[in-house]
Amino acid sequence: FWDSTGAEWASGTLAGKPAAVFTSTATMHGGQESTLLAMMLPLLHHGCVIVGIPFTEPRLSSTQTGGTPYGASHVSGADGKAAFSEDEKVLAKALGRRVAQISLKLGA
């Protein structure tokens, strides 16, 4: 996908726009943070403003399932069928709210 965005990169279409990432893994230690960080790199090359989840979000410190400061995440279980936990839902919504709030502040 990113290889097809050369024209947008060259023209700066996404520069200054807020962006966030999210992922799902089978286990709690299945590479969520490294995946989220890797997904940020093309966004940074495009000049996006990366939005994460700050630790002012209480569920970030207490989640036993998904959710990191780098973005929302879900632990799907080995069979991929685990339902979203309440923490995961709250953190995903918090990330969405932050993207919307920052979009408004940036006029993006």
Language model: regions and residue ranges:
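Glycine-rich phosphate/pyrophosphate-binding loop and the adjoining helix
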Residues: 52-108
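Helix-loop-strand module that forms the ligand-binding subsite of alpha/beta enzymes
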Residues: 1-61
